[in-house]
Amino acid sequence: MRRRSFLLLFGLLFTILLPAQQKLSSRFRANIPLDSIRLSDPCILADKKTNIYYMTGTGGLLWKSQNLATWEGPYRVTEIDTASWMGHTPDIWAAELHEYKDKYYYFATFTNNAIRIDSVKGNVIPRRASHVLVSDTPDGPYKPMKDSIYLPAGMPTLDGTFWVDKDNKPYMVYCHEWLQNWNGTIEKIELKPDLSGSVGKGKILF
């Protein structure tokens, strides 16, 4: 009985002490060879503060490594606002991690297939947009900021990335999906200094 009580207490303590960002998925493993990880649109952040590599991509999960050869994970690191347009279980595509002004930012494409925004040439277009989450640490948790919308709601956008121009203004560079304009354009939109929202309207680059 004492042994069972001790194990129960130990388990509770372990759960309490486990940081919020360390939410292991059911597929968590350690010492995973890089070529064993199946991941689309991978992006790796080499974090100088922790001397650790952080990898994410489509699917919204995260892996860690100290040598780029073997990894541990995946971790669940996103916390979305389920009351927003994203809903409860959005698809997450092409996620990226960026360090900027002592914060960490999660740029990704979120899709809510339950919301239809347009139909062009027989193609139903769901609510899809590039969006930004923030964290104090590279392994999350990444949470929403002030603005729930960075780009027009009726415009499907994807594959957003981060860019700072020569005047130190931050931007999101993204794609206006071809399904709507039947060609696809690469555009940019200025971000607020803390990246918590967008400023003005997007501009076509090409």
Which residues fall in each region the model found?
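Bacterial Sec-dependent N-terminal signal peptides
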Residues: M1-L24
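Carbohydrate-active catalytic/glycan-binding domains of CAZyme proteins
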Residues: A20-F206
